[in-house]
Amino acid sequence: MIETGIYEQIINSLFKSKIESADDSAFFIENKKIGREEAATILSRYLFLKLAEQGFRVEASALTPKESKMALMLYYDMFDAAGRFESLQQMFDAFAADRLLVEEMKETVYEMRERCVAPEKEDNSALAFSMPLKVHGVYTKAQIQVAIGTNLINRKSSSREGCERNYDLGIEAMYVDIIKDWEEGSNTNYNDFALDRQAFHWETQNSVSPQSAIGQKYINKELHMLLFVRQQATVPEDKSRRMGYIYLGEVDLVSYEGSRPMRIVWRLRTPMAESTYSFAAKFKALG
């Protein structure tokens, strides 16, 4: 059985912009920020409707690889830590045993499904067959890490960098924070920004040169480069915070120059939305 009261935390987290704090029995991160519209978009991805309608009485082994990742996204959105359950099946069984939780989820899903207006497009990456991401969709970092295979049910990624790689899959995720209010003259150079709706200027980490191993991978196009951007009011102290990134899809190398860091121009396979371009082009960024 799920701990008493956790269904209230689940529902409240979907309907409130902020949870003041979570008690020791809760599994939600403190001050989790998620609005109604974002929650509606998230719910549409998680198979919530399918799972809730069946009272979570499903066989995890029957899910496709993409559906399994969707379910693992659900796990991390609820618990935000590895090891709460040993398997997705154990999570489904625990949910199914709590009838009140199931009924609350059903009611919430139906209500928010009606509000969900998500201008998303099919994934354009080479890994679209297995990744549950939609271009222009909004995702937390934990959800992205599930998609690229660095978050597992028994292991959570410890990455706090502006990029994250899974060499087994040949993927690199670029996490770019677009800073709205940054101090002129700051020692930090914010040099990641949209050149137009289909071109993005990005700087590598300071250690990367064209001759370095990772620099060669960029030049030789050995990695599938996935671009994620989000707007921040100020410089974030913790890049792992659960604010959403907009997925701009796989990008391709156009040009590069410089060393430590390299300055790279990427071409987006799908043009970014005008609303994204309006902040990504106007403000410089922290990557």
Show which residues each predicted segment covers.
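Compact mixed alphabeta submodule
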Residues: 237-287
